[in-house]
Amino acid sequence: MIEEISVRFQGGKIVEAHAARGNQVLQRMIETDEGARRLGEVSLVPHSSPIASSGLLFLNTLFDENAACHIALGQAYSTCLKDGDTLTPEQLASRGANNSLIHVDWMIGSNRIDVDGISAAGDSEPVMRAGEWV
């Protein structure tokens, strides 16, 4: 397990990464390919989600990721884009979908998460406060 991950993004790409535990695994992971240093998923999950409220750690990403906000490095899910399952890799890339051999999730949620959306006009709108939907 990789714990206490810290990353710095520049231009949409990880330029620095460190983990208190599992750092060598993290470094190898982000060196897999060019897409491994970019986000493939961002998911907002309220701190009060039923799985989070259960207090259980399943040690299974498919369950645990539903307990907290999470991000994933690597491959984007094409099915998250309109008609994504019919698009070529080039069309997916033109729509901003990342391509990589990996898709690795990690949880970042807590009751301290604040998220703001930025409109096309540059205005900031609160989306989450203290880990909950506004």
Where are the model-predicted features located?
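Metal/cofactor-centered catalytic core regions of large enzymes
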Residues: M1-V134
